[in-house]
Amino acid sequence: MSNVLAINAGSSSLKFQLIKMPEEQVIAKGLVERIGMPDAIFSVEADGEKDKKVTEIADHSVAVKMLLESLTSTGVIQSFDEIDAVGHRVVHGGEYFSDSVLITDEIIQQIEEISELAPLHNPANLTGIHAFKEILPEIPMVAVFDTAFHQSMPEASYMYSLPREYYEEYGIRKYGFHGTSHKYVSERAADLLGVPLSNLRLISCHIGNGASVTAIKDGESIDTSMGFTPLAGVTMGTRSGNIDPALIPYIMDKTGKTADEVLNVLNKESGMLALSGFSSDLRDIEEKSETDARAELALDVFAGRIHKYIGSYAAKMNGLDAIIFTAGVGENSVTIREKILTGLEFMGIYWDPKLNDVRGKEQFINYPHSPVKVIIIPTNEEAMIAKDTVRLSGLNS
């Protein structure tokens, strides 16, 4: 048995779970918010007890010390020696990393080199790595990349129709994201179906405030909806998804906005927020959809884009064995799943409205005779991080 810390470090936040492996049992979990502020928030949950404090947390190193001290002071562990390894989420692995990797000084340097591909996320992820290495220098640490799962995509899926030197000199290509989630649910789907992953054609729909659809054939990602950045693909909470690129200079010309300002609109002021006119939260939009035409339109656009990707990816794989719904909306929105699945019967997808009336629970929602299965699988990226950390740290799980 091993105790693995799964870490997700943001620019001013630090999420953590202490997981007992191989049982995947969460012993403790918590969140540090507003790092660098005088009123930072530290919350931890262990043994059913929740503790929350507001205090000054100067930087990530202080946050890590608080995190570790809370684990010992609450008796979750007796000493830091009981932490066998630490797994870090890293958003972008570029073309360097097609798998998770044991962290060394050389690996840290490579992550730094590709940080320009994810300037908001990779530096924050690295800050978390440095903070833990400072306090737990002898403990093995593993980097788990959001992009790694998609490195199996063939060139025909990831290349853009742009001058070749843009790819060769600047790394411009499709990378895809949410890979850790797509990998986890695909492995879980194989278990539930009782079929080896190497014999399955799956479409994984990770639908939260950010959303992506991935075609998984024989256990490998062969295409995914997000692109060079997480802005591409389907309509999302505040992100536009795919648009005509000529709109960017057109909007600049009409509004006087800079390219960065237009990009900010596409990332933070578009998507469901723009379509509905009042919220990026699907729950709010669903609530008003019966009486608000724009809310109903937002739901139709959101579901319709995902619906199209399912048809496209089924064609790309020459068939389909199962559709997976995961993440906050995918797991909990009966309405969105219904809108996405309606009209796919011609593909052999027969879903049961009664079974679909479920939230946050692992469940098949197809009729027994349906050739294509439809499964809700709650994602667990932390468990996937822990599994990869155990595998690469050489721990006996």
Curated annotation (Swiss-Prot):
SUPFAM superfamilies: Actin-like ATPase domain. It comes from Oceanobacillus iheyensis (strain DSM 14371 / CIP 107618 / JCM 11309 / KCTC 3954 / HTE831). Its cofactor is Mg(2+); Mn(2+). Pfam families: Acetate_kinase (PF00871). This is Acetate kinase. The active site is at D146 (proton donor/acceptor). Its EC number is 2.7.2.1. CDD domains: ASKHA_NBD_AcK_PK. The gene is ackA. Mg(2+) binds at N8, E381.
